[in-house]
């Protein structure tokens, strides 16, 4: 059996507008990923959302993945999901970043794509 954890920078309610809480959320979720790595969990998935105040504060999962790759040894780190919107960015740019991340994580990068909740 394989285990995974999903992280998205969740900050509930009024705390979502507190920049200190955002920092603490990032640190706490990094600790979850490091704990999961030490306990042989297979995957850590990081969501991507923009301009949401009470659901997800994580707008740059690739940055978080770079940090987590340096702090972990075994767990696979992935985006959940990158929404491919040509209006936002050309899909080739996503492919380039995924290939680069795979090198820096020693083949532990997992790229997830699909239609997100806010996709149109």
Segments and roles (model prediction):
Residues 1-79:
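N-terminal beta1-alpha1-beta2 module of alpha/beta enzyme domains
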Residues 2-22, 86-120:
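Flexible, glycine-rich active-site loops centered on histidine and acidic residues
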Residues 50, 82, 116:
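Catalytic metal-binding/acid-base residues of hydrolase active sites
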Residues 80-86:
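Conserved strand-turn element in the central/C-terminal portion of the radical SAM core barrel
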